[in-house]
Amino acid sequence: MITESAINDILANPFDREWTIQGFGMLRTYLDDEQVQRLHIWDTSEAVEDVSTIHDHPWDFTSLILRGAIRNQRFALHEMGESDTGKPFTSAQIRCGVGGGLLSDPRPVRICSLGVEAYGPGDTYSMLAPELHESFPSRGAVTVIKRSF
């Protein structure tokens, strides 16, 4: 994982890097040529209005919280008719970032809360690609993820 000194250099000189912003208010920049490690700066005031923040990923990852705090809510997803429990929700596959958009037709599902986890500076957590979750960062939280393909 990248050193804290290197992260501090990036934060002190942010215009030396290419950044993109996710619809839920997370700035990101890749830290290596292979795009395995990524730095995130969270600011939900930059989120797109009415954006859904419940999502999964196309890869597994481990996240290290450097500054601020993250609450992570995991969910179980059930196809309609499998279960009467949970909250009705609409699911669709999307591509995030520049040039992103819908990749599949939306479908009705149900989601059930699996509990909330809380993390602070120095903490790590891991997610498998298909795990549905929602992140609640403190404003200005800084994290580094390491992706596994």
Role assignments for model-derived ranges:
Residues 139-149:
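A short hydrophobic beta-strand segment most commonly corresponding to one strand
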